[in-house]
Swiss-Prot record:
GO terms for molecular function: ferrochelatase activity; metal ion binding. This is Ferrochelatase. Its main location: cytoplasm. GO terms for cellular component: cytoplasm. It comes from Nitratiruptor sp. (strain SB155-2). GO terms for biological process: heme biosynthetic process. It is found in: Cytoplasm. The gene is hemH. Keywords: Cytoplasm, Heme biosynthesis, Iron, Lyase, Metal-binding, Porphyrin biosynthesis. Its EC number is 4.98.1.1.
Length: 309
Protein backbone atom coordinates (compact mmCIF):
# COMPACT_ATOMS: atom_id res chain seq x y z
CA UNK A 1 0.00 0.00 0.00
CA UNK A 2 1.06 3.60 -0.69
CA UNK A 3 0.67 6.58 1.61
CA UNK A 4 1.02 10.35 1.46
CA UNK A 5 2.18 12.06 4.63
CA UNK A 6 1.66 15.81 4.78
CA UNK A 7 4.35 17.40 6.95
CA UNK A 8 3.98 20.72 8.72
CA UNK A 9 5.16 22.58 11.80
CA UNK A 10 1.92 22.03 13.72
CA UNK A 11 0.19 24.31 16.17
CA UNK A 12 -1.41 24.03 19.61
CA UNK A 13 -4.59 21.94 19.61
CA UNK A 14 -5.54 23.64 22.89
CA UNK A 15 -4.13 26.25 25.27
CA UNK A 16 -2.30 23.60 27.29
CA UNK A 17 -0.20 22.77 24.20
CA UNK A 18 1.05 26.34 23.71
CA UNK A 19 4.07 25.77 25.96
CA UNK A 20 4.79 22.40 24.32
CA UNK A 21 4.70 24.02 20.89
CA UNK A 22 7.11 26.79 21.88
CA UNK A 23 9.47 24.47 23.73
CA UNK A 24 9.71 21.97 20.87
CA UNK A 25 10.15 24.71 18.29
CA UNK A 26 12.98 26.48 20.10
CA UNK A 27 14.63 23.16 20.95
CA UNK A 28 14.87 22.34 17.23
CA UNK A 29 18.53 22.55 16.25
CA UNK A 30 17.48 23.84 12.84
CA UNK A 31 15.72 26.77 14.52
CA UNK A 32 18.17 27.39 17.35
CA UNK A 33 21.54 26.16 16.03
CA UNK A 34 23.23 25.49 19.37
CA UNK A 35 25.29 22.29 19.14
CA UNK A 36 25.22 21.46 22.83
CA UNK A 37 21.87 19.73 23.44
CA UNK A 38 21.67 20.66 27.12
CA UNK A 39 22.48 24.31 26.44
CA UNK A 40 19.95 24.45 23.61
CA UNK A 41 17.27 22.93 25.87
CA UNK A 42 18.04 25.50 28.54
CA UNK A 43 17.88 28.41 26.09
CA UNK A 44 14.66 26.99 24.62
CA UNK A 45 13.20 26.76 28.11
CA UNK A 46 14.09 30.37 28.89
CA UNK A 47 12.65 31.68 25.60
CA UNK A 48 9.49 29.63 26.14
CA UNK A 49 9.01 30.98 29.65
CA UNK A 50 9.38 34.52 28.34
CA UNK A 51 6.92 34.07 25.48
CA UNK A 52 4.27 31.62 26.66
CA UNK A 53 1.99 34.14 28.36
CA UNK A 54 1.75 36.38 25.30
CA UNK A 55 1.46 33.38 22.97
CA UNK A 56 -1.33 31.89 25.06
CA UNK A 57 -3.17 35.22 24.94
CA UNK A 58 -2.82 35.29 21.16
CA UNK A 59 -4.23 31.79 20.79
CA UNK A 60 -7.12 32.71 23.08
CA UNK A 61 -8.09 35.28 20.45
CA UNK A 62 -8.18 32.44 17.90
CA UNK A 63 -10.56 30.34 19.97
CA UNK A 64 -7.93 28.62 22.11
CA UNK A 65 -6.12 26.70 19.38
CA UNK A 66 -4.26 26.98 16.10
CA UNK A 67 -6.44 26.87 12.96
CA UNK A 68 -3.72 24.86 11.19
CA UNK A 69 -5.00 21.46 12.30
CA UNK A 70 -8.56 22.25 11.20
CA UNK A 71 -7.45 23.17 7.69
CA UNK A 72 -5.05 20.22 7.52
CA UNK A 73 -7.82 17.75 8.35
CA UNK A 74 -10.12 19.26 5.72
CA UNK A 75 -7.32 19.08 3.16
CA UNK A 76 -6.60 15.44 4.02
CA UNK A 77 -10.28 14.52 3.66
CA UNK A 78 -10.47 16.03 0.16
CA UNK A 79 -7.14 14.55 -0.90
CA UNK A 80 -8.18 11.13 0.40
CA UNK A 81 -11.37 11.34 -1.65
CA UNK A 82 -9.35 12.14 -4.77
CA UNK A 83 -6.89 9.30 -4.12
CA UNK A 84 -8.94 6.45 -2.59
CA UNK A 85 -6.19 3.87 -3.13
CA UNK A 86 -3.62 5.93 -1.22
CA UNK A 87 -3.62 6.32 2.56
CA UNK A 88 -3.35 10.04 3.45
CA UNK A 89 -2.23 11.26 6.86
CA UNK A 90 -0.21 14.02 8.55
CA UNK A 91 2.79 14.46 10.83
CA UNK A 92 3.46 17.66 12.74
CA UNK A 93 6.85 18.84 13.92
CA UNK A 94 6.09 20.55 17.23
CA UNK A 95 2.65 19.37 18.38
CA UNK A 96 0.63 16.15 18.09
CA UNK A 97 0.22 14.20 15.93
CA UNK A 98 4.00 13.78 15.74
CA UNK A 99 5.93 11.72 13.17
CA UNK A 100 6.01 8.75 15.55
CA UNK A 101 2.22 8.60 15.60
CA UNK A 102 2.01 8.84 11.80
CA UNK A 103 4.57 6.06 11.43
CA UNK A 104 2.55 3.82 13.74
CA UNK A 105 -0.44 4.38 11.43
CA UNK A 106 1.65 3.50 8.39
CA UNK A 107 2.94 0.32 10.01
CA UNK A 108 -0.58 -0.68 11.07
CA UNK A 109 -1.82 -0.26 7.49
CA UNK A 110 1.23 -2.13 6.14
CA UNK A 111 2.30 0.82 3.99
CA UNK A 112 5.40 -0.07 1.98
CA UNK A 113 5.79 3.14 -0.07
CA UNK A 114 5.62 6.59 1.51
CA UNK A 115 5.39 9.98 -0.21
CA UNK A 116 6.44 12.78 2.13
CA UNK A 117 5.11 16.20 1.14
CA UNK A 118 6.27 19.05 3.39
CA UNK A 119 3.59 21.73 3.09
CA UNK A 120 6.20 24.47 2.80
CA UNK A 121 6.30 25.79 -0.79
CA UNK A 122 9.89 27.04 -0.39
CA UNK A 123 12.78 24.99 0.97
CA UNK A 124 14.41 26.02 4.22
CA UNK A 125 16.55 24.20 6.73
CA UNK A 126 14.23 25.62 9.41
CA UNK A 127 11.11 24.02 7.94
CA UNK A 128 11.50 21.45 5.14
CA UNK A 129 14.79 19.97 6.34
CA UNK A 130 13.61 19.96 9.95
CA UNK A 131 10.37 18.10 9.15
CA UNK A 132 11.97 15.55 6.82
CA UNK A 133 14.89 14.94 9.16
CA UNK A 134 12.50 14.41 12.07
CA UNK A 135 10.38 11.90 10.13
CA UNK A 136 13.33 9.89 8.82
CA UNK A 137 15.02 9.80 12.23
CA UNK A 138 11.81 8.60 13.84
CA UNK A 139 11.29 5.93 11.16
CA UNK A 140 14.82 4.68 11.70
CA UNK A 141 14.36 4.75 15.47
CA UNK A 142 11.29 2.51 15.42
CA UNK A 143 12.65 0.24 12.68
CA UNK A 144 10.15 1.23 10.01
CA UNK A 145 11.43 0.24 6.58
CA UNK A 146 9.65 1.41 3.44
CA UNK A 147 10.38 3.03 0.11
CA UNK A 148 10.43 6.77 0.77
CA UNK A 149 9.98 9.70 -1.60
CA UNK A 150 10.13 13.37 -0.70
CA UNK A 151 10.22 16.81 -2.30
CA UNK A 152 12.20 19.94 -1.51
CA UNK A 153 9.69 22.57 -2.69
CA UNK A 154 6.77 23.12 -5.03
CA UNK A 155 6.53 26.89 -5.54
CA UNK A 156 6.96 26.43 -9.30
CA UNK A 157 3.99 24.07 -9.60
CA UNK A 158 1.50 25.53 -12.08
CA UNK A 159 -1.61 24.28 -10.28
CA UNK A 160 -0.35 25.54 -6.93
CA UNK A 161 0.16 29.00 -8.38
CA UNK A 162 -3.33 28.88 -9.88
CA UNK A 163 -4.64 28.16 -6.37
CA UNK A 164 -2.85 31.28 -5.13
CA UNK A 165 -4.19 33.45 -7.96
CA UNK A 166 -7.71 32.24 -7.16
CA UNK A 167 -7.29 33.27 -3.51
CA UNK A 168 -5.97 36.70 -4.50
CA UNK A 169 -8.91 37.28 -6.84
CA UNK A 170 -11.35 35.96 -4.24
CA UNK A 171 -10.03 38.40 -1.62
CA UNK A 172 -10.86 41.42 -3.76
CA UNK A 173 -14.36 40.15 -4.50
CA UNK A 174 -14.73 42.06 -7.76
CA UNK A 175 -12.91 45.24 -6.71
CA UNK A 176 -10.59 46.86 -9.22
CA UNK A 177 -7.12 45.30 -8.80
CA UNK A 178 -5.53 48.45 -10.22
CA UNK A 179 -6.53 50.28 -7.05
CA UNK A 180 -4.48 47.91 -4.88
CA UNK A 181 -0.85 47.36 -4.01
CA UNK A 182 -0.23 43.60 -3.69
CA UNK A 183 2.17 42.76 -0.87
CA UNK A 184 3.55 39.23 -0.66
CA UNK A 185 4.24 38.63 3.02
CA UNK A 186 6.83 35.93 3.73
CA UNK A 187 7.81 34.48 7.08
CA UNK A 188 11.09 36.12 7.99
CA UNK A 189 14.34 34.33 8.86
CA UNK A 190 17.49 35.54 10.58
CA UNK A 191 19.91 36.92 8.00
CA UNK A 192 22.63 34.57 9.33
CA UNK A 193 20.67 31.51 8.20
CA UNK A 194 20.50 32.87 4.64
CA UNK A 195 24.21 33.72 4.72
CA UNK A 196 24.96 30.09 5.60
CA UNK A 197 23.41 29.00 2.30
CA UNK A 198 19.73 28.49 3.08
CA UNK A 199 17.91 28.93 -0.30
CA UNK A 200 14.66 30.19 1.25
CA UNK A 201 15.05 33.88 0.30
CA UNK A 202 16.05 33.09 -3.27
CA UNK A 203 13.09 30.74 -3.71
CA UNK A 204 10.64 33.26 -2.25
CA UNK A 205 11.97 35.95 -4.59
CA UNK A 206 11.68 33.57 -7.56
CA UNK A 207 8.13 32.74 -6.50
CA UNK A 208 7.18 36.42 -6.41
CA UNK A 209 8.51 36.77 -9.97
CA UNK A 210 6.42 33.79 -11.11
CA UNK A 211 3.24 35.16 -9.57
CA UNK A 212 3.77 38.70 -10.82
CA UNK A 213 4.40 37.38 -14.33
CA UNK A 214 1.06 35.54 -14.18
CA UNK A 215 -0.76 38.58 -12.79
CA UNK A 216 1.06 40.91 -15.21
CA UNK A 217 -0.02 44.52 -14.62
CA UNK A 218 -3.31 43.82 -12.86
CA UNK A 219 -2.21 45.50 -9.61
CA UNK A 220 -0.90 49.01 -9.02
CA UNK A 221 2.34 47.56 -7.67
CA UNK A 222 3.97 44.41 -6.31
CA UNK A 223 6.02 44.15 -3.12
CA UNK A 224 7.76 41.59 -0.90
CA UNK A 225 7.90 42.04 2.87
CA UNK A 226 8.62 39.83 5.88
CA UNK A 227 6.67 39.05 9.02
CA UNK A 228 7.09 37.14 12.31
CA UNK A 229 10.47 38.50 13.38
CA UNK A 230 11.63 37.45 16.82
CA UNK A 231 14.52 38.66 18.96
CA UNK A 232 17.32 41.21 18.49
CA UNK A 233 19.28 39.56 15.62
CA UNK A 234 19.15 40.91 12.06
CA UNK A 235 16.22 39.45 10.10
CA UNK A 236 15.23 39.62 6.45
CA UNK A 237 13.96 43.04 5.42
CA UNK A 238 11.81 44.97 4.85
CA UNK A 239 9.45 44.11 7.67
CA UNK A 240 5.76 44.12 6.84
CA UNK A 241 5.21 47.01 9.25
CA UNK A 242 7.80 49.05 7.33
CA UNK A 243 6.15 48.18 4.01
CA UNK A 244 2.74 49.24 5.32
CA UNK A 245 4.24 52.55 6.45
CA UNK A 246 5.74 53.03 2.98
CA UNK A 247 2.37 52.38 1.34
CA UNK A 248 0.10 54.17 3.82
CA UNK A 249 -2.69 56.11 2.20
CA UNK A 250 -3.09 53.36 -0.41
CA UNK A 251 -5.22 50.24 -0.69
CA UNK A 252 -3.24 47.12 0.19
CA UNK A 253 -3.88 43.41 -0.33
CA UNK A 254 -1.56 41.05 1.55
CA UNK A 255 -0.93 37.51 0.37
CA UNK A 256 0.91 35.18 2.84
CA UNK A 257 3.29 33.62 0.33
CA UNK A 258 5.12 31.32 2.78
CA UNK A 259 2.03 29.43 3.91
CA UNK A 260 -0.23 26.88 2.25
CA UNK A 261 -2.62 26.67 5.21
CA UNK A 262 -3.92 29.44 7.43
CA UNK A 263 -2.40 29.44 10.91
CA UNK A 264 -1.68 31.83 13.77
CA UNK A 265 0.75 33.83 11.61
CA UNK A 266 -2.03 34.57 9.14
CA UNK A 267 -5.18 34.63 11.26
CA UNK A 268 -3.64 36.45 14.22
CA UNK A 269 -0.65 38.39 12.90
CA UNK A 270 -2.00 39.42 9.51
CA UNK A 271 -5.74 39.60 10.18
CA UNK A 272 -5.50 41.18 13.65
CA UNK A 273 -2.07 42.66 14.55
CA UNK A 274 -1.10 44.10 11.16
CA UNK A 275 -4.69 45.17 10.48
CA UNK A 276 -4.47 47.32 13.62
CA UNK A 277 -1.14 48.76 12.47
CA UNK A 278 -2.60 49.51 9.03
CA UNK A 279 -5.55 51.33 10.56
CA UNK A 280 -3.34 53.28 12.94
CA UNK A 281 -0.94 54.58 10.29
CA UNK A 282 -3.64 55.44 7.77
CA UNK A 283 -3.64 52.66 5.18
CA UNK A 284 -6.66 53.45 3.00
CA UNK A 285 -7.88 49.86 2.86
CA UNK A 286 -6.24 46.69 4.18
CA UNK A 287 -7.14 43.18 3.08
CA UNK A 288 -5.58 39.75 3.57
CA UNK A 289 -6.06 36.87 1.14
CA UNK A 290 -6.65 33.40 2.51
CA UNK A 291 -4.12 30.61 2.02
CA UNK A 292 -5.02 27.83 -0.45
CA UNK A 293 -6.17 25.65 2.50
CA UNK A 294 -8.44 22.88 1.19
CA UNK A 295 -9.33 24.57 -2.10
CA UNK A 296 -10.01 22.28 -5.05
CA UNK A 297 -7.12 23.79 -6.97
CA UNK A 298 -4.67 23.12 -4.14
CA UNK A 299 -5.91 19.53 -3.97
CA UNK A 300 -5.28 19.33 -7.73
CA UNK A 301 -1.76 20.62 -7.11
CA UNK A 302 -1.04 18.04 -4.40
CA UNK A 303 -2.30 15.22 -6.62
CA UNK A 304 -0.03 16.51 -9.39
CA UNK A 305 2.94 16.79 -7.01
CA UNK A 306 2.34 13.24 -5.75
CA UNK A 307 2.07 11.81 -9.27
CA UNK A 308 5.35 13.46 -10.26
CA UNK A 309 7.31 12.15 -7.26
Amino acid sequence: MKAIVLLNMGGPNNLEEVELFLRNMFNDKNILPIRNDLLRKFVAYMITQGRKKEARSNYEKLGGKSPLNFYTDRLIAKLQKRLPDVYVTKAMRYTPPFAKEAIKELMYHNVREVFLIPLYPHYSTTTTKSSLEDFYNMAKGVGYHARFHDIANFYENRLYNQAIIERIEEALDGEDTKEYELVFSAHSLPQKIIEKGDPYLQEVQEHVKILTSILEEKFSGYHLAFQSKLGPVKWLEPGLDEKLEELKGKKILVYPISFTLDNSETEFELHIEYAQIAQKIGVKKYKVARCPNESDRFVDALVDIYQRM
